[in-house]
Regions:
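Periplasmic binding protein-like
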Residues: 22, 27, 46, 210-227
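Short helix-loop capping/hinge motifs at secondary-structure junctions, enriched
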Residues: 70-90
Length: 227
């Protein structure tokens, strides 16, 4: 026996539209875009403040990969970037200095550092023949095995408190000597027409500014069209 006389399926293309539907009580739960989250969390008296909750994490892990042979739009090699990313000190600036806490807040505004993952897979996915979980083994090799979530500082930034002044100087000196010009531009592509993707990328761009300084590395937000 059918429980409903009519069922409506709504395809939502944008989180701003989803929020409007939530306000009209047409949706029970939604993800929020950056501007809406900021509006709600910045005002303790906002009517939706008490309705915020952590979203259950997806059983997956995401990773950023460097392109060591980047080409320009015309097909010619991006020599400036390719030289920069081949430099060890330059790459270590990402590892030891890029603070992504604000970016993680796009996915978990309440406890952003729960999104931190310094390993290639999510926790609990892989085990060796002795039953040891993969990420615990990697943490030991990286010197992280004594570190735990504290809700304040990313694990990989704790050894130097995110201070990369010496590494930055080293990278800039070494790269300037081989003709690299600054700032180095890092390209980050998002799907065209998505305000959610743009909000998230804009936060990431600010993370680059705060962590590196715009005199060193600048994130360029690029778009692609899904076919």
């Amino acid at each position: 026996v059918s429980r409903f006389e009519r069922l409506t399926v709504t395809m939502i293309s944008d989180q701003a539209i989803a929020f409007q539907l939530y306000q009209n009580r047409e949706l029970d739960e939604i993800d929020l875009n950056e501007s809406t989250i900021t509006t709600i969390t910045s005002d303790p008296n906002n009517e939706y403040n008490s309705q915020l909750c952590e979203k259950r994490a997806r059983p997956s892990a995401y990773a950023m990969h460097f392109n060591y042979q980047k080409n320009n739009a015309d097909g010619t090699p991006d020599v400036n970037w390719n030289k920069a990313i081949a430099n060890t000190a330059f790459r270590q600036c990402f590892y030891r200095g890029l603070n992504l806490k604000a970016w993680f807040s796009r996915y978990n505004k309440i406890n952003p550092l729960k999104c931190e993952n310094d390993y290639y897979t999510m926790k609990g996915l892989c085990y060796n023949t002795q039953g040891a979980e993969y990420t615990t083994l990697v943490a030991k090799e990286m010197g992280f095995d004594g570190e735990a979530y504290d809700g304040k500082t990313m694990i990989r930034l704790r050894s130097n408190n995110g201070d990369i002044a010496d590494l930055k100087k080293q990278a800039m000196d070494e790269l300037s000597a081989i003709g690299v010009t600054f700032p180095v531009h890092a390209a980050y592509h998002i799907i065209a027409g998505s305000t959610t993707a743009l909000d998230t990328a804009t936060v990431l761009k600010q993370c680059f500014t705060d962590s590196f300084g715009d005199d060193f590395i600048v994130l360029d937000i690029k778009t692609y069209v899904s076919s």
